[in-house]
Design a protein with these regions (language model features):
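Local sequence-structure signature of Cys/Sec-based thiol-disulfide redox active-site neighborhoods
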Residues: 3-48
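Amphipathic alpha-helical interface surfaces
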Residues: 34-37, 41, 66, 70, ...
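Thioredoxin-like thiol-disulfide oxidoreductase module
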Residues: 55-79
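Non-catalytic, surface beta->alpha helical segment in thiol-disulfide oxidoreductase systems
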Residues: 87-114
């Protein structure tokens, strides 16, 4: 799918992370199982040939500005909107990480999970 405004091909999955202590978020003294599950989901999708990119606000702020819908959500709800999961250019989940099943449904069936804005 090509973005009509930018002319760029949409990535399969983009994850816009809240501020984390490191790129994976797995660097603190307490292990966050949600982030472990996310890491496993990303590995699974990539093994299936999907392109998955995570954007951290501190490391890649331009990504948050380039995506108009993501930028608008952050302006409206600030950091409470994060994390945001985008599948093929469409927001499919906010406030929590999408599960592997939710991302697969959005990718394979073209359906958007009910929790989308």
């Amino acid at each position: 799918m090509t973005d009509p405004v930018t002319g760029l091909t949409a990535l399969d999955v983009e994850i816009f992370d809240p501020p984390l202590c490191c790129p994976t978020g797995l660097c603190g003294p307490v292990l966050d199982t949600t982030l472990v599950d996310l890491g496993e989901a990303i590995i699974s999708l990539q093994a299936a040939g999907r392109t998955v990119v995570r954007h951290m606000m501190t490391a890649d702020p331009q990504a948050f500005l380039r995506n108009r819908e993501v930028y608008q959500l952050i302006r409206e709800r600030q950091l409470a909107a994060l994390p945001i999961t985008v599948v093929r250019g469409q927001i499919v989940k906010t406030d929590a990480y999408a599960t592997l099943d939710e991302m697969r449904v959005a990718l394979e069936a073209g359906l958007v999970p009910a929790s989308a804005p």
